[in-house]
């Protein structure tokens, strides 16, 4: 019976034991009718519910306004998720700006029982708001149009909802006011917000228990500012989320706040925006995965299919195919920055970043960086792969000389320096601008040691003993300094004492776990595996509950802040995605070693959280193609940062383990994204200026991106077909428009850049004992053995129309 009482309150009938049976019976009949009719006006009450749906909207006329309740179905009961008292849409107008009074003129459902229209008259104009059912069982589409009166200054129009489950009083690093909260950016004050400049994966989300809800803007190629999302967990009696036309202004690095003085341009005669309400019962703290899937389904997937030219450079359009990029990266750029280095025994070299470890950017130095950002070993790995592919002995020799230099880093009980200065023949422990130059940094050392092991496994097995000897000493250092909790401190001074910052809590521990688990695979020593597992158990216990992805970049990079910074308005901590990436990698390593599916499941959860920082569209107000790129953290605003090349390989690895084709598509988009903005590290670093970011060197741009392509192209070729899963994707300057698999016949329609005359198509899920028939772009099918497709792929000659 309690389930029926809340509409009584909404209708203004206060339930008491003395109320008449007639009143209760009347309300029960209304609710029964609303369920039968789905969307029907009954005495000022309208209910919108999809057949078999998970979401229901109830709107009741209340005085001059209309109260709303968005409910989700949980355990066969309807539970409130979002509420509105009076008016969902808030209009700020006049000078000075003030909230406008509105009055509902009509509230009605359409004849098909699929939409509700609310028409209101406001002191500043006329408003129509339409809520519609969709093909998705947990989604309501909302469209708002506000037509202002002539001569009035309109400052903002936005829809705001209260989160019905409310919040708890708790606010600790493992238990917050709500179980899950997410916005692209956090706040430094109550008037901060998330403008369209920050719409990488546009949504705001809240979850308490199993009740999950989100607002998702409906975007397209014509979407232009000012559009903004907002979220507040603690300032009012209940948390709220909002979306609408709200001007903003930038401040700090890099935040935005409401611009109360700005007036919205009315070129089209009115203000319009659309969005989706997503609400449903979801696994605790994991509702965001529903949004990750929907973001790609509604924006990313179609954008990828439409774009054959995602890797075409915005400033040098002659660079578009991977072979063109190979010439630019490996034959020109790498040769320009390569330097031979004198070292004991000889054979050392570097691909210089030409940075300054103290951040004195006007004083660049020839150097070698073995850093979590600028990882020379990884770039040299890609260069070596290119040398193998082209049978270029000189390139392989130069690439291996970078490994030789890294192995010369002086060790102190296993800890080692990660920056080498060529002119002064000097090793520096760590980055002095984004770290502490006199301290050893485990995040950078572990990433370097991991890539040393990759060299030993994949490229230079003849140096395996030398490499393992070096990294084993470092592995022993980590094991001996791991805290009982499982955390591995981030920084150690010259006496190998841990620094207080990040000593007891950090996300960088995941990077050390990744290395330790990989080391255990090679050495077969359980000590390293146990230490890596304990480290990831720490991540699961202390980091995941409130997504405390704290690494050096969170606090020590351009978006600087104190180590104790916390956004008490949205109840979110600052976080950065470098540690998130390495955590997803470490969970995957744990799964491969242990074969325990729980590690793969947790890793997939972490990967999906990481994907909230991937761009699912290319905004029309920026020049480059930005689909697939990654931003960095929730206190900065750049687009298509070079880290996306790291994420691309990670996504491909998860695709191979899970079979989730979305991961494959996202991997392709991420791998292409850097090339659109290279050689710069990113685009629109402050979020809103249509210009390239800084030039931070070969290893954070062209070189790092090309390395990912070399790693991935052996599996993906120029285009890739997974026969078992019946899915295909273009990788190099092409897109698969159509795939049809019938028995052993494979039909492909591929659109490619005009300059590509042939494509190497690679295959997975092939039965090697079967003969296939393969046809590309309408040509006659050819017969080809399955084992040949697996071994060599297929070279498709393209028609002149491409």
Regions found by a protein language model. Give the residues of each.
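Boundary at the C-terminal end of the N-terminal hydrophobic targeting segment
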Residues: 37-39
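Beta-strand/loop-rich accessory regions of lumenal/periplasmic or secreted enzymes
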Residues: 64, 74-280
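Bacterial N-terminal signal peptides
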Residues: 24-34
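Glycan-recognition and catalytic cores of secretory/periplasmic carbohydrate-active enzymes
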Residues: 195, 202, 234-242, 247, ...
């Amino acid at each position: 019976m309690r389930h029926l009482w809340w509409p009584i309150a909404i209708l203004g009938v206060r339930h008491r034991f003395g109320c008449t049976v007639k009143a209760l019976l009347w309300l029960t009949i209304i609710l029964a009718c609303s369920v039968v009719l789905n969307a029907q006006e009954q005495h000022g009450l309208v209910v919108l519910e999809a057949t078999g749906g998970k979401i229901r909207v109830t709107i009741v006329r209340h005085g001059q306004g209309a109260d709303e309740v968005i409910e989700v179905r949980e355990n066969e009961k309807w539970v409130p998720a979002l509420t509105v008292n009076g008016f969902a849409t808030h209009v700020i107008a006049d000078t000075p700006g003030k909230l406008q009074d509105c009055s509902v003129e009509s509230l009605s459902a359409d004849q098909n029982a699929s939409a509700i229209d609310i028409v209101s008259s406001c002191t500043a104009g006329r408003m129509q708001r339409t809520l519609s059912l969709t093909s998705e069982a947990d989604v309501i589409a909302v469209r708002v149009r506000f037509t202002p009166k002539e001569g009035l200054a309109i400052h903002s129009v936005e829809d705001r909802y209260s989160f019905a489950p409310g919040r708890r009083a708790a606010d600790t690093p493992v238990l917050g006011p709500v179980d899950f909260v997410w916005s692209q950016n956090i706040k430094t004050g109550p008037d901060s917000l998330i403008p369209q400049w920050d719409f990488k994966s546009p949504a705001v989300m809240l979850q308490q228990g199993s009740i999950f809800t989100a607002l998702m803007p409906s975007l397209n190629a014509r979407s232009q500012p000012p559009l903004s999302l907002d979220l507040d967990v603690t300032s009012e009696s209940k948390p709220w989320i909002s979306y609408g036309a709200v001007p903003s202004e930038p401040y700090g690095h890099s935040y935005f706040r409401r611009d109360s003085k700005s007036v919205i341009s009315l070129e089209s005669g009115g203000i319009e925006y659309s969005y989706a309400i997503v609400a449903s019962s979801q696994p605790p703290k994991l509702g965001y995965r529903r949004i990750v899937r929907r973001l790609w389904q509604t924006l990313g997937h179609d954008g990828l299919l439409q774009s054959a030219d995602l890797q075409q450079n915005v400033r040098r359009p002659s660079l578009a195919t991977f072979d063109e990029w190979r010439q630019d990266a490996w034959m020109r750029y790498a040769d320009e920055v390569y330097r031979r280095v004198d070292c004991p025994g000889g054979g050392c070299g570097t691909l210089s970043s030409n940075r300054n470890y103290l951040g004195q950017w006007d004083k660049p130095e020839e150097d070698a960086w073995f850093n979590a950002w600028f990882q020379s070993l990884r770039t040299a790995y890609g260069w070596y792969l290119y040398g193998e592919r082209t049978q270029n002995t000189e390139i392989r020799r130069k690439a291996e000389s970078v490994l030789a230099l890294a192995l010369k880093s002086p060790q102190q009980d296993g800890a080692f320096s990660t920056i080498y200065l060529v002119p002064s023949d000097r090793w520096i422990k760590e980055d002095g601008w984004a770290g502490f130059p006199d301290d050893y940094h485990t995040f950078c050392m572990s990433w370097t040691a991991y890539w040393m092991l990759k060299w030993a496994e994949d490229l230079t097995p003849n140096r395996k003993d030398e490499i393992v000897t070096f990294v084993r000493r470092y592995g022993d250092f980590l094991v001996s300094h791991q805290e009982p909790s499982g955390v591995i401190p981030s920084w150690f001074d010259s006496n190998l004492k841990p620094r207080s910052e990040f000593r007891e809590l950090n996300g960088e521990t995941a990077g050390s776990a990744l290395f330790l688990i990989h080391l255990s695979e090679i050495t077969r020593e359980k000590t390293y595996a146990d230490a890596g597992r304990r480290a990831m158990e720490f991540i699961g216990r202390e980091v995941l509950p409130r997504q405390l992805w704290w690494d050096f970049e969170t606090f020590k990079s351009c978006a600087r802040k104190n180590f104790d910074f916390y956004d008490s308005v949205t109840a979110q901590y600052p976080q950065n995605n470098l540690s998130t990436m390495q955590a997803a990698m470490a969970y995957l390593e744990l799964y491969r070693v242990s074969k325990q599916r729980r590690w793969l499941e947790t890793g997939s959860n972490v990967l999906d959280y990481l994907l909230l920082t991937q761009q699912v569209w290319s905004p029309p107000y920026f020049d480059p193609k930005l689909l697939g790129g990654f931003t960095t953290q929730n206190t900065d605003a750049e687009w298509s940062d070079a880290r996306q090349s790291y994420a691309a390989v990670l996504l491909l690895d998860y695709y191979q383990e899970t079979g989730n084709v979305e991961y494959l598509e996202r991997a392709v988009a991420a791998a292409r994204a850097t090339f659109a903005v290279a050689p710069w590290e990113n685009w629109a670093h402050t979020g809103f200026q249509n210009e390239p970011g800084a030039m931070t060197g070969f290893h954070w741009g062209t070189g790092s991106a090309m390395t990912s392509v070399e790693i991935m192209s052996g599996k993906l070729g120029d285009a890739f077909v997974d026969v078992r899963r019946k899915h295909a994707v273009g990788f190099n300057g092409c897109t698969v428009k159509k795939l049809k698999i019938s028995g052993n016949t494979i039909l492909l329609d591929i659109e490619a850049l005009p300059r590509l005359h042939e494509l190497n198509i690679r295959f997975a899920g092939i039965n090697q004992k079967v003969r296939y028939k393969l046809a590309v772009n309408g040509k006659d099918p050819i017969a080809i053995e399955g084992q040949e497709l697996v071994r060599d792929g297929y070279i498709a000659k393209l028609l002149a129309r491409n």
